[in-house]
Amino acid sequence: ATDPRAREEVAAAWGVAELPSRYGRDTGQIVEAAATGELGALVVAGVELADLPDPRRAREALSAVGFLVSLELRPSEVTERADVVLPVAAVAEKAGTFINWEGRVRMFEAALKPDQMTRRVAPTDGRVLQMLADAMDVHLGLPDLRTTRAELDRLGAWDGARANEPVEVAASLPRPAAGEAVLAGHRLLLDQGRLQDGD
């Protein structure tokens, strides 16, 4: 958002005069804006409230917002509060592209084909967002994966300056005594994480 060259390149590719020069809201700012009534509607996709920095405030925000759309695979705290729940395909059921924080692109194809499924495959997140945009008379111009990938290819890889790689000092690891062990896990994936549903 702060690099004029990047904004100019994307604006030219998209055929618009200019792009905003300010940053958009981060998750905490979105939650706060919804909780205080500054945002009238939210589209929430695949978010587990317990994984957010302030789950209590997130619950307040979802209850306060005027209209809530949820894109989800399974019931959640978000779907319980949503005005509309739209099912979306799981990663294994769709093709797509991941772009990591460094801007590296990784395309993937569907692991499961429609003829391998016992139910009708739900639409992709991108297709659902396109349908919502169409209903709001907003032209995204990304009706399918092929068009979206062509758009990413047209933009090309960023060759300008990048943020410095973060440097963190590793914390000292606990040393177990004889006969002891240290169990370490990632809070977002274990404990009460959604990946444990049904287990």
Predicted ranges, named:
Residues 4-119, 128-137, 143, 147-199:
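A cross-kingdom feature strongest in bacterial/archaeal respiratory oxidoreductases
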